[in-house]
Protein backbone atom coordinates (compact mmCIF):
# COMPACT_ATOMS: atom_id res chain seq x y z
CA UNK A 1 0.00 0.00 0.00
CA UNK A 2 2.82 2.39 0.88
CA UNK A 3 4.60 1.57 -2.37
CA UNK A 4 1.42 2.23 -4.37
CA UNK A 5 0.79 5.55 -2.61
CA UNK A 6 4.42 6.62 -3.07
CA UNK A 7 4.32 5.75 -6.78
CA UNK A 8 1.05 7.67 -7.20
CA UNK A 9 2.57 10.72 -5.48
CA UNK A 10 5.57 10.63 -7.82
CA UNK A 11 3.31 10.36 -10.86
CA UNK A 12 1.18 13.29 -9.74
CA UNK A 13 4.26 15.42 -9.02
CA UNK A 14 5.71 14.53 -12.42
CA UNK A 15 2.45 15.44 -14.14
CA UNK A 16 2.31 18.80 -12.39
CA UNK A 17 5.90 19.65 -13.31
CA UNK A 18 5.31 18.80 -16.97
CA UNK A 19 2.14 20.93 -16.97
CA UNK A 20 4.12 23.89 -15.60
CA UNK A 21 6.10 24.00 -18.88
CA UNK A 22 2.94 24.83 -20.88
CA UNK A 23 2.58 28.59 -21.58
CA UNK A 24 -1.07 28.23 -22.73
CA UNK A 25 -0.65 30.12 -26.00
CA UNK A 26 -3.49 30.72 -28.42
CA UNK A 27 -3.34 29.02 -31.82
CA UNK A 28 0.05 29.22 -33.50
CA UNK A 29 1.30 32.15 -31.41
CA UNK A 30 4.60 31.46 -29.68
CA UNK A 31 6.52 34.57 -28.56
CA UNK A 32 6.43 36.46 -25.24
CA UNK A 33 7.33 40.14 -24.96
CA UNK A 34 8.56 41.76 -21.74
CA UNK A 35 6.88 45.17 -21.53
CA UNK A 36 9.30 46.36 -18.88
CA UNK A 37 7.82 48.94 -16.46
CA UNK A 38 4.72 49.61 -18.56
CA UNK A 39 1.51 50.67 -16.84
CA UNK A 40 -1.32 48.15 -16.72
CA UNK A 41 -3.85 50.03 -18.82
CA UNK A 42 -1.18 50.84 -21.41
CA UNK A 43 -0.48 47.10 -21.66
CA UNK A 44 -4.19 46.41 -22.08
CA UNK A 45 -4.33 48.86 -24.96
CA UNK A 46 -1.16 47.40 -26.49
CA UNK A 47 -2.62 43.89 -26.33
CA UNK A 48 -5.69 45.01 -28.25
CA UNK A 49 -4.15 47.39 -30.77
CA UNK A 50 -0.74 45.88 -31.52
CA UNK A 51 0.25 42.60 -29.84
CA UNK A 52 -2.78 40.52 -30.79
CA UNK A 53 -2.91 41.75 -34.41
CA UNK A 54 0.84 41.08 -34.76
CA UNK A 55 0.58 37.57 -33.33
CA UNK A 56 2.35 37.94 -29.98
CA UNK A 57 1.48 35.16 -27.54
CA UNK A 58 1.98 36.79 -24.16
CA UNK A 59 3.39 39.58 -22.02
CA UNK A 60 5.77 39.39 -19.10
CA UNK A 61 4.86 42.27 -16.79
CA UNK A 62 6.89 43.93 -14.06
CA UNK A 63 6.32 42.96 -10.40
CA UNK A 64 2.75 43.70 -9.31
CA UNK A 65 3.19 43.81 -5.52
CA UNK A 66 3.71 46.92 -3.41
CA UNK A 67 7.36 47.96 -3.31
CA UNK A 68 9.59 50.34 -1.42
CA UNK A 69 9.81 53.95 -2.67
CA UNK A 70 13.48 54.72 -3.43
CA UNK A 71 14.97 58.13 -4.12
CA UNK A 72 14.90 58.90 -7.85
CA UNK A 73 12.61 55.89 -8.46
CA UNK A 74 15.18 53.50 -10.03
CA UNK A 75 13.70 50.51 -11.88
CA UNK A 76 15.02 48.11 -9.25
CA UNK A 77 12.74 49.47 -6.54
CA UNK A 78 10.08 47.18 -8.07
CA UNK A 79 12.21 44.25 -6.86
CA UNK A 80 12.07 45.36 -3.21
CA UNK A 81 8.69 44.20 -1.84
CA UNK A 82 6.93 45.80 1.13
CA UNK A 83 3.69 43.81 0.93
CA UNK A 84 1.62 41.73 -1.48
CA UNK A 85 -0.91 44.50 -2.09
CA UNK A 86 -1.34 44.99 -5.83
CA UNK A 87 -0.46 48.68 -6.01
CA UNK A 88 2.62 49.91 -7.86
CA UNK A 89 3.56 52.72 -10.20
CA UNK A 90 2.05 50.59 -12.98
CA UNK A 91 -1.40 50.81 -11.39
CA UNK A 92 -3.71 49.33 -8.78
CA UNK A 93 -5.46 45.96 -8.47
CA UNK A 94 -8.54 47.05 -10.39
CA UNK A 95 -6.42 48.26 -13.31
CA UNK A 96 -4.31 45.10 -13.19
CA UNK A 97 -7.41 42.92 -13.32
CA UNK A 98 -8.79 44.91 -16.24
CA UNK A 99 -5.51 44.50 -18.13
CA UNK A 100 -5.46 40.73 -17.61
CA UNK A 101 -9.07 40.39 -18.76
CA UNK A 102 -8.61 42.56 -21.85
CA UNK A 103 -5.40 40.81 -22.89
CA UNK A 104 -6.88 37.34 -22.36
CA UNK A 105 -9.91 38.37 -24.42
CA UNK A 106 -7.66 38.91 -27.46
CA UNK A 107 -5.52 35.83 -26.84
CA UNK A 108 -2.49 37.46 -25.22
CA UNK A 109 -1.47 35.75 -21.98
CA UNK A 110 -0.05 37.55 -18.94
CA UNK A 111 2.96 36.28 -16.97
CA UNK A 112 3.86 38.10 -13.76
CA UNK A 113 7.41 38.65 -12.51
CA UNK A 114 7.10 37.45 -8.90
CA UNK A 115 9.43 37.90 -5.93
CA UNK A 116 9.35 34.88 -3.63
CA UNK A 117 12.94 35.01 -2.40
CA UNK A 118 13.04 38.19 -0.38
CA UNK A 119 11.54 41.41 0.86
CA UNK A 120 13.08 44.90 0.74
CA UNK A 121 16.66 45.57 1.76
CA UNK A 122 17.81 47.84 4.58
CA UNK A 123 16.21 51.26 4.85
CA UNK A 124 16.97 53.98 7.37
CA UNK A 125 13.98 54.19 9.68
CA UNK A 126 10.45 53.51 8.48
CA UNK A 127 10.01 52.72 4.80
CA UNK A 128 6.81 53.58 2.95
CA UNK A 129 5.56 51.52 0.03
CA UNK A 130 3.66 52.37 -3.13
CA UNK A 131 0.34 51.52 -1.43
CA UNK A 132 1.22 53.57 1.66
CA UNK A 133 2.18 50.56 3.79
CA UNK A 134 4.91 51.13 6.36
CA UNK A 135 7.71 48.68 7.15
CA UNK A 136 11.02 48.55 8.98
CA UNK A 137 13.24 46.43 6.74
CA UNK A 138 16.27 46.70 9.02
CA UNK A 139 14.21 44.97 11.73
CA UNK A 140 12.68 42.53 9.21
CA UNK A 141 9.28 43.92 10.12
CA UNK A 142 6.74 43.93 7.28
CA UNK A 143 3.29 44.33 8.90
CA UNK A 144 1.55 44.61 5.53
CA UNK A 145 1.97 40.83 5.01
CA UNK A 146 2.66 40.36 7.96
CA UNK A 147 6.24 39.09 8.28
CA UNK A 148 8.55 39.45 11.27
CA UNK A 149 12.15 38.44 11.93
CA UNK A 150 11.22 34.80 12.57
CA UNK A 151 10.07 34.46 8.94
CA UNK A 152 13.52 35.17 7.52
CA UNK A 153 16.85 33.41 7.37
CA UNK A 154 19.49 34.79 9.77
CA UNK A 155 21.30 37.82 8.38
CA UNK A 156 24.44 36.98 6.43
CA UNK A 157 26.18 38.16 3.27
CA UNK A 158 26.93 36.15 0.13
CA UNK A 159 30.72 36.24 -0.12
CA UNK A 160 31.32 32.80 -1.67
CA UNK A 161 29.14 31.93 -4.65
CA UNK A 162 30.39 28.34 -4.46
CA UNK A 163 28.81 27.91 -1.03
CA UNK A 164 25.26 26.57 -1.41
CA UNK A 165 24.28 27.69 2.11
CA UNK A 166 25.29 31.29 1.38
CA UNK A 167 23.65 31.36 -2.05
CA UNK A 168 20.32 30.08 -0.74
CA UNK A 169 20.14 31.38 2.83
CA UNK A 170 22.11 34.63 2.90
CA UNK A 171 20.95 37.99 1.60
CA UNK A 172 21.21 38.73 -2.11
CA UNK A 173 22.57 42.30 -2.30
CA UNK A 174 21.19 42.98 1.18
CA UNK A 175 17.59 41.94 0.44
CA UNK A 176 15.92 40.34 3.46
CA UNK A 177 15.91 36.62 2.71
CA UNK A 178 12.63 34.79 3.35
CA UNK A 179 12.62 31.28 4.79
CA UNK A 180 10.56 29.34 2.24
CA UNK A 181 10.63 26.20 4.42
CA UNK A 182 8.43 28.03 6.96
CA UNK A 183 4.76 27.06 6.85
CA UNK A 184 3.73 30.68 7.37
CA UNK A 185 5.95 32.02 4.59
CA UNK A 186 4.77 29.30 2.25
CA UNK A 187 1.14 30.10 3.01
CA UNK A 188 1.58 33.82 2.28
CA UNK A 189 3.44 33.17 -0.98
CA UNK A 190 0.81 30.67 -2.13
CA UNK A 191 -1.97 33.09 -1.17
CA UNK A 192 -0.29 35.86 -3.22
CA UNK A 193 0.18 33.67 -6.31
CA UNK A 194 -3.31 32.18 -6.05
CA UNK A 195 -4.79 35.68 -6.01
CA UNK A 196 -3.02 36.45 -9.28
CA UNK A 197 -4.30 33.16 -10.74
CA UNK A 198 -7.82 34.15 -9.69
CA UNK A 199 -7.36 37.41 -11.61
CA UNK A 200 -6.56 35.43 -14.76
CA UNK A 201 -2.78 35.33 -15.19
CA UNK A 202 -1.29 32.42 -17.13
CA UNK A 203 1.88 32.01 -15.12
CA UNK A 204 4.92 33.46 -13.42
CA UNK A 205 8.52 34.44 -13.97
CA UNK A 206 10.15 33.52 -10.64
CA UNK A 207 12.87 36.03 -9.79
CA UNK A 208 16.08 34.82 -8.10
CA UNK A 209 14.94 31.18 -8.15
CA UNK A 210 18.47 29.82 -7.62
CA UNK A 211 18.51 31.57 -4.23
CA UNK A 212 15.67 29.29 -3.05
CA UNK A 213 15.90 25.55 -2.47
CA UNK A 214 14.23 23.63 -5.29
CA UNK A 215 12.31 21.46 -2.81
CA UNK A 216 10.72 24.56 -1.27
CA UNK A 217 9.71 25.86 -4.69
CA UNK A 218 8.33 22.46 -5.62
CA UNK A 219 6.06 22.57 -2.56
CA UNK A 220 4.87 26.09 -3.38
CA UNK A 221 4.25 25.38 -7.08
CA UNK A 222 2.41 22.12 -6.41
CA UNK A 223 0.14 23.89 -3.90
CA UNK A 224 -1.08 26.52 -6.36
CA UNK A 225 -4.59 26.59 -7.77
CA UNK A 226 -5.32 25.62 -11.35
CA UNK A 227 -5.70 28.47 -13.82
CA UNK A 228 -9.01 30.32 -13.91
CA UNK A 229 -11.36 28.76 -16.48
CA UNK A 230 -13.31 32.04 -16.60
CA UNK A 231 -10.35 33.47 -18.55
CA UNK A 232 -10.41 30.79 -21.23
CA UNK A 233 -8.04 28.24 -19.71
CA UNK A 234 -9.01 24.56 -19.99
CA UNK A 235 -9.99 22.72 -16.83
CA UNK A 236 -7.06 21.56 -14.68
CA UNK A 237 -4.52 23.83 -16.42
CA UNK A 238 -1.43 24.55 -14.35
CA UNK A 239 0.33 27.94 -14.28
CA UNK A 240 3.29 28.25 -16.63
CA UNK A 241 6.43 28.77 -14.57
CA UNK A 242 9.78 30.06 -15.80
CA UNK A 243 12.54 30.53 -13.27
CA UNK A 244 15.49 32.91 -13.19
CA UNK A 245 18.52 30.69 -12.64
CA UNK A 246 21.81 32.27 -13.68
CA UNK A 247 24.08 29.34 -14.51
CA UNK A 248 27.18 29.88 -16.62
CA UNK A 249 28.22 26.26 -16.13
CA UNK A 250 29.89 24.55 -13.16
CA UNK A 251 27.73 26.50 -10.70
CA UNK A 252 27.21 25.10 -7.20
CA UNK A 253 23.47 25.68 -7.61
CA UNK A 254 22.66 24.32 -11.05
CA UNK A 255 19.86 25.10 -13.49
CA UNK A 256 19.27 21.33 -13.64
CA UNK A 257 17.85 21.41 -10.11
CA UNK A 258 14.93 23.53 -11.35
CA UNK A 259 14.20 22.44 -14.91
CA UNK A 260 11.70 19.74 -13.94
CA UNK A 261 9.70 22.32 -11.94
CA UNK A 262 9.18 24.62 -14.92
CA UNK A 263 11.16 26.34 -17.66
CA UNK A 264 14.49 27.94 -16.76
CA UNK A 265 16.10 31.10 -18.13
CA UNK A 266 18.96 30.01 -20.43
CA UNK A 267 21.47 32.80 -19.82
CA UNK A 268 24.16 31.12 -21.90
CA UNK A 269 21.86 31.55 -24.92
CA UNK A 270 21.94 35.32 -24.36
CA UNK A 271 25.71 35.43 -23.94
CA UNK A 272 26.57 33.18 -26.89
CA UNK A 273 24.17 34.80 -29.35
CA UNK A 274 25.73 38.12 -28.38
CA UNK A 275 29.21 36.74 -29.00
CA UNK A 276 28.20 35.45 -32.43
CA UNK A 277 26.55 38.61 -33.71
CA UNK A 278 29.25 40.85 -32.28
CA UNK A 279 31.57 38.95 -34.63
CA UNK A 280 33.42 36.97 -31.96
CA UNK A 281 32.21 33.63 -33.38
CA UNK A 282 31.54 32.69 -37.00
CA UNK A 283 27.84 32.27 -37.71
CA UNK A 284 28.52 28.90 -39.36
CA UNK A 285 28.83 27.40 -35.87
CA UNK A 286 25.17 28.22 -35.20
CA UNK A 287 24.07 25.19 -37.23
CA UNK A 288 24.18 23.11 -34.02
CA UNK A 289 22.57 25.85 -31.91
CA UNK A 290 20.64 24.80 -28.82
CA UNK A 291 21.38 21.54 -27.05
CA UNK A 292 24.42 21.13 -29.30
CA UNK A 293 25.90 24.08 -27.43
CA UNK A 294 25.16 22.54 -24.05
CA UNK A 295 21.93 24.47 -23.54
CA UNK A 296 18.87 23.08 -21.78
CA UNK A 297 16.38 20.93 -23.70
CA UNK A 298 14.26 23.17 -25.91
CA UNK A 299 10.99 22.81 -24.00
CA UNK A 300 12.70 23.68 -20.71
CA UNK A 301 14.60 26.78 -21.90
CA UNK A 302 13.30 30.35 -21.72
CA UNK A 303 15.41 32.10 -24.36
CA UNK A 304 16.22 35.76 -24.94
CA UNK A 305 18.80 38.03 -26.58
CA UNK A 306 18.79 40.35 -23.56
CA UNK A 307 16.75 40.92 -20.42
CA UNK A 308 16.15 43.87 -18.12
CA UNK A 309 19.20 42.96 -16.01
CA UNK A 310 21.93 41.91 -18.40
CA UNK A 311 21.18 44.59 -20.99
CA UNK A 312 22.62 47.01 -18.43
CA UNK A 313 25.87 45.09 -17.98
CA UNK A 314 29.11 45.26 -19.93
CA UNK A 315 30.13 42.20 -21.92
CA UNK A 316 28.91 40.18 -24.87
CA UNK A 317 25.16 40.69 -24.36
CA UNK A 318 23.55 42.81 -27.09
CA UNK A 319 20.95 45.50 -26.49
CA UNK A 320 19.06 48.19 -28.39
CA UNK A 321 22.15 50.42 -28.46
CA UNK A 322 23.69 48.14 -31.14
CA UNK A 323 20.68 48.01 -33.45
CA UNK A 324 22.04 46.11 -36.47
CA UNK A 325 23.56 43.11 -34.66
CA UNK A 326 20.65 43.19 -32.19
CA UNK A 327 18.09 42.86 -34.99
CA UNK A 328 20.14 40.10 -36.64
CA UNK A 329 20.42 38.19 -33.36
CA UNK A 330 16.69 38.59 -32.76
CA UNK A 331 15.89 37.34 -36.26
CA UNK A 332 18.03 34.24 -35.71
CA UNK A 333 16.51 33.74 -32.25
CA UNK A 334 12.97 33.74 -33.61
CA UNK A 335 13.77 31.74 -36.75
CA UNK A 336 15.74 28.89 -35.18
CA UNK A 337 13.52 26.20 -33.58
CA UNK A 338 14.92 26.21 -30.07
CA UNK A 339 13.50 27.38 -26.76
CA UNK A 340 10.52 29.35 -25.46
CA UNK A 341 11.16 32.77 -26.96
CA UNK A 342 10.91 36.12 -25.18
CA UNK A 343 11.76 39.49 -26.70
CA UNK A 344 12.64 42.61 -24.74
CA UNK A 345 10.83 45.95 -24.81
CA UNK A 346 12.98 48.52 -23.06
CA UNK A 347 13.14 52.14 -22.08
CA UNK A 348 16.22 54.25 -22.77
CA UNK A 349 18.88 54.24 -20.06
CA UNK A 350 22.18 56.02 -19.50
CA UNK A 351 23.26 54.14 -16.40
CA UNK A 352 22.32 51.04 -14.43
CA UNK A 353 19.76 52.82 -12.23
CA UNK A 354 17.89 54.92 -14.81
CA UNK A 355 14.16 54.95 -13.96
CA UNK A 356 11.44 54.41 -16.56
CA UNK A 357 10.19 57.57 -18.30
CA UNK A 358 8.41 59.65 -15.66
CA UNK A 359 6.95 63.10 -15.11
CA UNK A 360 7.90 65.75 -12.56
CA UNK A 361 5.78 63.98 -9.93
CA UNK A 362 7.67 60.70 -10.60
CA UNK A 363 4.67 59.07 -12.24
CA UNK A 364 5.45 56.67 -15.09
CA UNK A 365 4.38 58.23 -18.38
CA UNK A 366 2.62 56.32 -21.15
CA UNK A 367 4.50 55.50 -24.36
CA UNK A 368 3.78 57.69 -27.33
CA UNK A 369 4.13 56.67 -30.97
CA UNK A 370 5.25 58.37 -34.17
CA UNK A 371 3.58 58.04 -37.56
CA UNK A 372 5.32 54.69 -38.17
CA UNK A 373 4.18 53.28 -34.82
CA UNK A 374 7.60 53.47 -33.18
CA UNK A 375 7.83 54.63 -29.57
CA UNK A 376 9.15 58.04 -28.61
CA UNK A 377 9.40 59.95 -25.28
CA UNK A 378 12.01 57.70 -23.70
CA UNK A 379 10.51 54.32 -24.54
CA UNK A 380 12.49 52.09 -26.93
CA UNK A 381 9.81 49.45 -27.63
CA UNK A 382 11.95 47.00 -29.61
CA UNK A 383 8.81 44.89 -30.08
CA UNK A 384 7.46 47.65 -32.35
CA UNK A 385 10.51 47.59 -34.62
CA UNK A 386 9.40 46.05 -37.92
CA UNK A 387 12.44 43.75 -37.93
CA UNK A 388 11.27 42.30 -34.58
CA UNK A 389 7.49 42.04 -34.95
CA UNK A 390 7.92 40.69 -38.48
CA UNK A 391 9.98 37.82 -37.08
CA UNK A 392 7.24 37.12 -34.54
CA UNK A 393 4.98 36.62 -37.57
CA UNK A 394 7.66 34.47 -39.21
CA UNK A 395 7.89 32.27 -36.12
CA UNK A 396 4.12 31.82 -36.13
CA UNK A 397 4.09 30.97 -39.84
CA UNK A 398 6.76 28.25 -39.55
CA UNK A 399 5.63 26.67 -36.30
CA UNK A 400 6.10 22.88 -36.07
CA UNK A 401 8.68 22.77 -38.89
CA UNK A 402 12.34 21.79 -38.65
CA UNK A 403 15.60 23.23 -39.97
CA UNK A 404 16.40 22.10 -43.52
CA UNK A 405 18.67 23.32 -46.30
CA UNK A 406 21.41 24.81 -44.12
CA UNK A 407 23.98 26.76 -46.13
CA UNK A 408 27.02 28.76 -45.05
CA UNK A 409 30.08 30.23 -46.72
CA UNK A 410 32.44 28.72 -44.16
CA UNK A 411 32.30 31.94 -42.15
CA UNK A 412 29.49 34.34 -41.21
CA UNK A 413 27.09 34.19 -44.11
CA UNK A 414 24.36 31.62 -43.44
CA UNK A 415 20.90 30.63 -44.56
CA UNK A 416 18.40 27.93 -43.69
CA UNK A 417 14.83 26.87 -44.31
CA UNK A 418 12.03 26.04 -41.91
CA UNK A 419 10.44 23.14 -43.74
CA UNK A 420 8.74 24.53 -46.83
CA UNK A 421 7.27 27.50 -44.96
CA UNK A 422 10.12 29.90 -44.26
CA UNK A 423 13.64 30.98 -45.19
CA UNK A 424 16.21 33.14 -43.38
CA UNK A 425 19.56 34.51 -44.59
CA UNK A 426 22.11 36.49 -42.57
CA UNK A 427 25.32 38.29 -43.53
CA UNK A 428 27.72 39.18 -40.74
CA UNK A 429 30.77 39.45 -43.01
CA UNK A 430 32.36 42.65 -44.26
CA UNK A 431 31.54 41.75 -47.87
CA UNK A 432 28.28 41.18 -49.74
CA UNK A 433 26.23 38.00 -49.79
CA UNK A 434 25.09 37.49 -53.40
CA UNK A 435 24.05 33.92 -54.07
CA UNK A 436 21.39 31.68 -55.59
CA UNK A 437 20.17 29.79 -52.53
CA UNK A 438 17.62 27.10 -51.83
CA UNK A 439 14.72 28.77 -50.03
CA UNK A 440 12.70 25.50 -49.90
CA UNK A 441 9.60 27.61 -50.65
CA UNK A 442 6.99 26.93 -53.33
CA UNK A 443 7.53 28.87 -56.55
CA UNK A 444 6.43 32.49 -56.47
CA UNK A 445 7.46 35.95 -55.34
CA UNK A 446 7.91 36.65 -51.64
CA UNK A 447 8.22 39.83 -49.61
CA UNK A 448 11.27 40.18 -47.39
CA UNK A 449 9.53 41.00 -44.12
CA UNK A 450 12.70 42.52 -42.66
CA UNK A 451 13.05 45.35 -45.19
CA UNK A 452 9.35 45.91 -45.78
CA UNK A 453 5.78 44.76 -45.32
CA UNK A 454 3.20 43.07 -47.49
CA UNK A 455 0.40 45.61 -47.86
CA UNK A 456 -2.58 45.00 -50.15
CA UNK A 457 -0.60 42.42 -52.09
CA UNK A 458 2.43 44.65 -52.65
CA UNK A 459 5.81 44.55 -50.89
CA UNK A 460 7.22 47.81 -49.54
CA UNK A 461 10.75 46.35 -49.28
CA UNK A 462 12.86 43.79 -51.11
CA UNK A 463 11.18 40.88 -52.86
CA UNK A 464 12.61 37.53 -53.94
CA UNK A 465 11.38 35.40 -56.82
CA UNK A 466 11.60 31.67 -56.13
CA UNK A 467 11.77 29.26 -59.08
CA UNK A 468 10.15 25.85 -59.44
CA UNK A 469 13.17 24.24 -57.76
CA UNK A 470 12.86 26.44 -54.68
CA UNK A 471 15.89 28.60 -55.46
CA UNK A 472 16.00 32.39 -55.35
CA UNK A 473 18.67 35.06 -55.76
CA UNK A 474 19.60 36.44 -52.34
CA UNK A 475 21.52 39.69 -51.92
CA UNK A 476 22.46 41.18 -48.55
CA UNK A 477 25.04 43.92 -48.86
CA UNK A 478 27.69 44.28 -46.17
CA UNK A 479 26.44 47.80 -45.56
CA UNK A 480 22.73 46.95 -45.66
CA UNK A 481 20.75 48.47 -42.82
CA UNK A 482 19.75 45.15 -41.27
CA UNK A 483 22.02 42.32 -42.45
CA UNK A 484 19.17 39.80 -42.59
CA UNK A 485 16.46 38.70 -45.03
CA UNK A 486 13.37 36.65 -44.14
CA UNK A 487 10.70 35.07 -46.35
CA UNK A 488 7.69 32.97 -45.40
CA UNK A 489 4.53 31.57 -46.91
CA UNK A 490 2.27 34.19 -45.32
CA UNK A 491 4.22 36.94 -47.10
CA UNK A 492 3.78 35.70 -50.67
CA UNK A 493 3.10 38.56 -53.07
UniProtKB/Swiss-Prot annotation:
Residues modified to Pyrrolidone carboxylic acid: 20
Catalysed transformations (reactions): Endohydrolysis of (1->4)-alpha-D-glucosidic linkages in polysaccharides containing three or more (1->4)-alpha-linked D-glucose units
Site feature: Transition state stabilizer: 309
Alphabetized InterPro entries for the sequence: A-amylase/branching_C, A-amylase_C, Alpha_amylase, Glyco_hydro_13_cat_dom, Glyco_hydro_b, Glycoside_hydrolase_SF
Cofactor entry: Ca(2+); chloride
GO molecular function (one): alpha-amylase activity
GO biological processes: carbohydrate metabolic process
Annotated localization: Secreted
One GO CC annotation: extracellular region
Enzyme class: hydrolase
UniProt superkingdom: Eukaryota
Classification via SUPFAM superfamilies: (Trans)glycosidases, Glycosyl hydrolase domain
Active-site annotation: 207 (nucleophile), 244 (proton donor)
Subunit structure of this chain's protein: Monomer.
Family (UniProt): Belongs to the glycosyl hydrolase 13 family.
Protein name: Alpha-amylase-related protein
Organism name: Drosophila erecta (Fruit fly)
Amino acid sequence: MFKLAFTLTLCLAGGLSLAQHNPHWWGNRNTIVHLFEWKWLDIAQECESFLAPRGFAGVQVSPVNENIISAGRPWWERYQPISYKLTTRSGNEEEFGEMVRRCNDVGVRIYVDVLLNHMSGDFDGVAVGTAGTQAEPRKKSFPGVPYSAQDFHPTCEITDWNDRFQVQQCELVGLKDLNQSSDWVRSKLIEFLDHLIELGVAGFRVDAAKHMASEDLEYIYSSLSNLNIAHGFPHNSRPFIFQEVIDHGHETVSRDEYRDLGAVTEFRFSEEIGNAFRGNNALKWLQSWGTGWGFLPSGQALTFVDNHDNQRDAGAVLNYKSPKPYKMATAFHLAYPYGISRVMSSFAFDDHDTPPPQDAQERIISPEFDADGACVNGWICEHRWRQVYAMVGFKNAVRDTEITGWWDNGDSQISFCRGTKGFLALNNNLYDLSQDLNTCLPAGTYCDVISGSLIDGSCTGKSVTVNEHGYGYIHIGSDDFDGVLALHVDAKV
